[in-house]
Swiss-Prot record:
GO molecular function, one term: structural constituent of ribosome
Lineage: Bacteria, Pseudomonadati, Pseudomonadota, Gammaproteobacteria, Alteromonadales
The encoding gene: rpsI
Annotated family: Belongs to the universal ribosomal protein uS9 family.
InterPro entries associated with the record: Ribosomal_Su5_D2-typ_SF, Ribosomal_uS9, Ribosomal_uS9_bac/plastid, Ribosomal_uS9_CS, Ribsml_uS5_D2-typ_fold_subgr
Ribosomal protein recorded as keyword: yes
Keyword Ribonucleoprotein: yes
Protein name: Small ribosomal subunit protein uS9
Length: 130
């Protein structure tokens, strides 16, 4: 059983996803819930499916995913990154097209911290000339 299972870890913002690919019919389970049940937004569901649609393997694998931390956008990005890594473990020849689309690279952008004396990270208090 372990021979035909592929694993990938994905991260984005504060989210971490562990993705297990197994040969199957295209079922996607995230934290023991279906994809459309876990992500209400269609855009998040689309982001999760992107790497599979690119390499035309939507119906080839069942996915068991555990994801934690962050919000919906970060979790969707982390899952996409994890799926990409698992697909590369399955077949290294897929690295080229996935890299070209930008799915292999870890998006390193993080939230900028709030500074003292400012309202937010860069938003300054209103300036009064007089």
């Amino acid at each position: 059983m372990a021979d035909n299972q592929y694993y990938g870890t994905g991260r984005r913002k504060n989210s971490t996803a562990r993705v297990f690919l197994r040969p199957g019919s295209g079922n996607i389970k995230i934290n023991n819930r279906e994809l459309n049940e876990y992500f209400g937004r269609e855009t998040a569901q689309m982001v999760v499916r992107q790497p599979l649609e690119l390499v035309e393997m939507t119906e080839k694998f069942d996915m068991y995913i555990t994801v934690s931390g962050g919000g919906t956008t970060g979790q969707a990005g982390a899952i996409r990154h994890g799926i990409t890594r698992a697909l590369m473990q399955y077949d290294e020849a897929l690295r080229g097209p996935l890299r070209k689309e930008g799915y292999v690279t870890r998006d390193a952008r993080q939230v900028e911290r709030k500074k003292i004396g400012l309202h937010k990270a860069r938003k300054r208090p209103q300036f009064s000339k007089r």
